[in-house]
């Protein structure tokens, strides 16, 4: 699993044991997202919606003809994780999205 968020939030994900990639602009986030999808190796890539200019269009365009990774735009990543259990939150979000629980 990979997470694209602002640099500070990405660092928090790395500290929690996930692969966090920091982006400071929509262009940087889009480039990272394209790179991660093309490179492969991830079943799930979560990205902070605030970093995408048009989240639905970005996901639709990148995933055309692909099954993996699952792209999961998430609103307010930074605010959601201040003082909370990052791993537990992501596990619950993944469970709701794909229908079963996984150990991150």
Swiss-Prot record:
The keyword Iron-sulfur does not apply. GO terms for molecular function: ATP binding; proton-transporting ATP synthase activity, rotational mechanism; proton-transporting ATPase activity, rotational mechanism. It comes from the Bacteria. It holds the Pfam family ATP-synt_F. Belongs to the V-ATPase F subunit family. Produces ATP from ADP in the presence of a proton gradient across the membrane. This is V-type ATP synthase subunit F. The gene is atpF.
């Amino acid at each position: 699993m990979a997470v694209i968020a602002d640099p500070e939030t990405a660092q928090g994900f790395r500290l929690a044991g996930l692969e966090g990639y920091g982006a400071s602009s929509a262009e940087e986030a889009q480039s990272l997202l394209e790179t991660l999808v093309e490179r492969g190796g991830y079943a799930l890539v979560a990205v902070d919606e605030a970093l995408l200019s048009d989240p639905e269009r970005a996901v639709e365009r990148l995933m055309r003809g692909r099954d993996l990774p699952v792209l999961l735009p998430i609103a307010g990543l930074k605010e959601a994780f201040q003082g909370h259990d990052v791993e537990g939150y992501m596990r619950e979000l993944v469970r709701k999205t794909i229908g079963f629980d996984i150990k991150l």
